[in-house]
Curated annotation (Swiss-Prot):
One of its GO terms (biological process) is regulation of transcription by RNA polymerase II. Orphan nuclear receptor. Residues 20-111 bind DNA. GO terms for molecular function: DNA-binding transcription factor activity; sequence-specific DNA binding; zinc ion binding. The lineage of its organism: Eukaryota, Metazoa, Ecdysozoa, Nematoda, Chromadorea. It comes from the Eukaryota. It comes from Caenorhabditis elegans. A zinc finger (NR C4-type) spans 23-44, 60-94. SMART domains: HOLI, ZnF_C4. This is Nuclear hormone receptor family member nhr-199.
Amino acid sequence: MFTLARVLNNIGSASSNEPIPYCLICSEVADGNHFGVAAACRACAAFFRRTVQHNKIHECGRNGQCFFLSCKFLLVGFQISPLSSDARSMCKACRYGKCLEMGMQRSSVQQRREQLGKRLNISDDRGKPVLNKLRRAYEMLILNRKHVHNRRENQAPRAIGFNELPIVFQNESTSIYQFLWEAFPEYSMLLPDTKLAFFKNFFLSFCLFESSFNGCSAKQKNVMLIPSGDYIDLAHSESFFTNDHQTFTERDNIEILAQRLKLIQSSITVPLSAENVDIYEFLALAGIILLESDSESEADFQEEAVKIKSNIIKDLLFHYQCINIYDDAAMRLGAVLSILPSIQVCCSRSNNFLIINSKDVSESQSPFSRIHGNQKYAQFVRSSQESLRHVLANFIKFICKFVSI
């Protein structure tokens, strides 16, 4: 097939020991073989890759009659050099058609992506060390939960009642604490007061955030998947307040709490679903939530927290480079980070913290006592030893304030 680029390539081959190859698509200087075409430039290769990966459909406004190659050339000695070209800014439909006409293969795009993924995975730990550490810690958290919550193999999830939630979060507190130690070694070096402050800010925020994320991952927008493997049915919130032994009778509070659960759904679940947040993005946001504590107990750690957050952002950008599916990684990063304010609205940074303990749990059995084992934390635990009814009533009041706007 006759093309201007092939003429240029033939002339260059005959006139120089080091010929300059020209792109068969746009006649700019080529840099190698791309997707089956012997000579193509990076710009045309990138254009073809994006079109194929995103299944873009371009339309020509001139019924496929665009004069695609509108280049002017200057003869310099025995070399022909393009002075200007507006080929790349012309009709995308005709440009894509030219790519196919010159031999670019759609199947080569996916094959190249797989090879790229394997190559980048070799240096994955070096490329995103913070996020990989977070993921390993999170995988350990998931494994630990099977034992902590006495989950049987292949046990079907069920909708839980309000009275069951305290035990779930009581057991979960120990697992989350271990997760923090594994994910952030810096956490273990903090003073006890600072550890507690960070844990207060993180625990319930993470539980709500993770429940929403898991609901999105399971394509179930009307449920909150809780750590035990069961769920809260947002579509039938009235069932959340009844069980075999007791019916919760404070109807006004029930309705308020049901509204707040729906607010959590709209403020956290919907944005996560809209952006189709993946596991690394979820862990990055979780890390930032922890590190944006209002605690000022240790100013030195606040400086360290800024560095860790910066490294999380760098890792996330490298993650986008690895998966190679977004045209603009910076735009994707901005879209994901824009979810944070919605999460922070629902997960207030107030000093109020929900302590869930039943009256049957002794101080020595409390997860906080097992974790911290000092007088201040023992006092913290003792203050939470109330009757189950009182705890449940406080839970309603807390949630109403917790997610109020």
